[in-house]
């Protein structure tokens, strides 16, 4: 019975990397996508509209990050996002940017652009090390 248990543990260790939801190919694709978003977001409106894409990439990347990286970016993101509430309860999606889809004053627009640039920089650093 012990050898069967040992065999099962070894099999699980060998199989578990294959079952991970975020593969190296996914990571590489997201790295290219972040670079593309930053490169193509030249005007203010495109930066504001691309913020949600950066947040989506961060959510996919989240499980593979160190605790320190998660806490750092979570703190930054939470300061600039609203909880999405449905009947007073957070939805499964969780959070959205405060800025997407709104008409912004010049001061708020500058703040939203700063958020995009800082978030993009933080996520890009995760890929480059």
Curated annotation (Swiss-Prot):
Keywords: Antibiotic, Antimicrobial, Glycoprotein, Immunity, Innate immunity, Secreted, Signal
Pfam families: Turandot (PF07240)
Residues carrying a glycan: 49
Described function: A humoral factor that plays a role in stress tolerance; gives increased resistance to the lethal effects of bacterial challenge and stress. Regulated by the JAK/STAT pathway and NF-KB-like Relish pathway in the fat body, upd3 in the hemocytes and Mekk1 in response to septic injury and consequent immune response.
Gene name linked to the record: TotA
Organism listed in the record: Drosophila yakuba
InterPro entries listed in its UniProt record: Turandot
Signal peptide (UniProt feature, chain positions): 1-21
Source lineage: Eukaryota, Metazoa, Ecdysozoa, Arthropoda, Hexapoda
Protein name: Protein Turandot A
Localization per record: Secreted
Family: Belongs to the Turandot family.
GO biological process, one term: response to cold
Main localization of the protein described in the UniProt heading: secreted
GO CC term (a single one): extracellular space
